[in-house]
Amino acid sequence: MNASTSAPPASDSTWSACSDDAVVPAEVRDAVDTVLGPSGLSRPEREILTTRIERWYPDLIDGLVTLYGDPAATRAAAEVLTEAAAAYVERDPELRHLDLARTLDPTWIQDPSRIGYAGYTERFAGDLRGVEKRIPYLRELGVSYLHLMPLLTPRPGDSDGGYAVADYRSVRPDLGDMDDLAHLTGELRKQNMSLVIDLVLNHVAAEHEWARRARAGEQRYRDYFFIYPDRAEPDEYEK
């Protein structure tokens, strides 16, 4: 194993002494360490993630065992947490700090003084840059929770109000782009405002990559969907 993918030495482990196989299996710890070891993150930064994994691993594995049984559940946990660790490494330090603050105060969202504002981007301000220009107005209203209705790229034409999403990784072109969205969230955070967007994940547009590949016959993607020989049963659901 080369240095770029090796786990940190045991002496530099950020797992707690009690994190034996009864809590987080060695297979999972090793998978996470393979990502964190060469990441360049400080020990405290790595320790924050491993502590969170130790805290929530029982909840994760319970759900995975229900779906896959053992030992497949442990392999799935290792895969999921490897991806989570990679995302954590790439995450903006400002957002990692926000994650920690919210972990320490899990009831933050239930604060009765929190004021929410929901609306459609195009009707409220034209586009995402327009929303950014209206932050002072939102601040004047006391808003701390801004919910922008569907703004991800939908299917062309009838898109169920924007909820038939063709691409979860891009913004509707008439509203801006992902850089505009990232900049808006940063400006909102400076005013202690949280941005919320809708992610409906139980269906996608027929134009979504997964749906296209399923129709093309790729079994992996066909397994993501309920597929019927004709419209008879789906039409019953829509009555």
Across the structure, where does each feature detected by a protein language model lie?
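Acidic/aromatic-lined carbohydrate-recognition and catalytic surfaces
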Residues: N2-K239
